[in-house]
A protein has these predicted regions:
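Flexible beta-alpha connector loops of hexameric P-loop NTPases
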Residues: 114-120, 154-157
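Conserved catalytic cores of soluble enzyme domains
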Residues: 144-270
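Terminal amphipathic helices with adjacent charged low-complexity linkers/tails
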Residues: 250-296
Length: 314
């Protein structure tokens, strides 16, 4: 039996609690900043008959079940070093949640922020999400709408890291882990490889598009006149190239199809479950953790002691 050496009435415990709660409040405000910034483009989404990125997330997940967002502070004070204006998340919403009863890795381009443009931190975050999917054998569901690489912040490292993302997709395919992609909007340049390397692709009529170059770049490079829809619209890919397996009427319909695809995988059919072992409740309250950990990196702390079980099973 471990006995905690933490004195919850000590000045240091009170200081730690106060400082850690302040940090949590700050983080939540920053996450709300990201959500509000994305929400500013709601009028544009509505004009296109689209759902916003967070509405897509809500429609995809099973109601009432938990969603664990991962790496939500990625990119903060990196591309924009000003803490008063910097937006965390790297234009990407990622995490683990339940889709049609199946635990999945969720990967959503936040096209409400810089049109979902990709930076180095976006790719680094994406690579970590892919590693999570591979390690835990989680089906990957990617809701795509991105302007591609941010060429205004060009760095050669971006392309090297991007290649790592494609390698990760190939490894997932080799492992038999399903990849489901929904084309909600643009997916150009390197972004077009994502649906190309997926097992199931759902494209939204009129809005979904995947091509190595959009119409404007094609015109600038060759002088040829075309449209995004003719170059790589969802209709073209569903009827001619074969990239798109399912053609959806709108975002809501596309996500309904994605949920049906995940359900049809039978991913958990051979999983018999694990019986929970009997255990006694912890001797110490989990509320003590926040006051046990100092905010500076110099002070020591008894990390394990407050969370030890009161006895019985492990």
């Amino acid at each position: 039996m471990f006995v905690s050496k933490i004195d919850i009435s000590s000045p240091s415990f009170e200081t730690n609690t106060k400082e850690n709660k302040a940090l949590l409040d700050k983080m939540n405000l920053l996450l709300e900043r990201a959500a509000q910034t994305s929400e500013k483009r709601r009028d544009i989404f509505e004009k296109r008959n689209q759902l916003s990125p967070r509405e897509r997330l809500g429609a995809l997940l099973d109601p009432g079940l938990p969603f664990l967002e991962l790496f939500n502070m990625a990119g903060y004070c990196v591309d924009d070093p000003d803490p008063e204006t910097s937006i965390p998340g790297s234009s990407l919403i990622g995490g683990i949640g339940y889709v049609s009863g199946v635990k999945c890795l969720i990967y959503i381009d936040d096209s409400g922020i810089n049109a979902g443009a990709t930076t180095i931190k976006t790719i680094e975050k994406g690579l970590l999400l892919l590693e999570m999917a591979k390690k835990h054998k989680l089906p990957l569901v990617h809701l795509v709408e991105s302007a591609g690489a941010n060429l205004m912040q060009y760095k050669v490292e971006l392309w090297a890291l991007g290649g790592g993302a494609f390698a990760g997709l190939a490894e997932m395919s080799a492992m038999g882990i399903p990849i489901i992609t929904v084309l909600h909007g643009l997916s150009t340049a390197g972004g077009a490889y994502m649906p190309g390397m997926s097992d199931y692709v759902i494209g939204v009529k009129e809005n979904g598009m995947a091509a190595l170059a959009g119409a404007n770049l094609l015109r600038a490079a060759t002088g040829e006149e075309s449209s995004d829809k003719d170059l790589g619209g969802a209709e073209v890919h569903s009827k001619i190239t074969g990239l798109v397996e399912y053609l959806a009427e709108d975002d809501k319909h596309a996500i309904e199809i994605a949920r049906e695809v995940v359900k049809s995988l039978g991913w958990d059919r051979d999983f018999t479950g694990v019986s929970a072992r009997n255990f006694l409740p912890p001797k110490y309250s989990s509320d003590e953790i926040i006051g046990s950990v100092p905010t500076d990196s110099v002070s020591y702390t008894h990390l394990t002691l407050p969370t030890k079980s009161g006895g019985g099973g492990g």
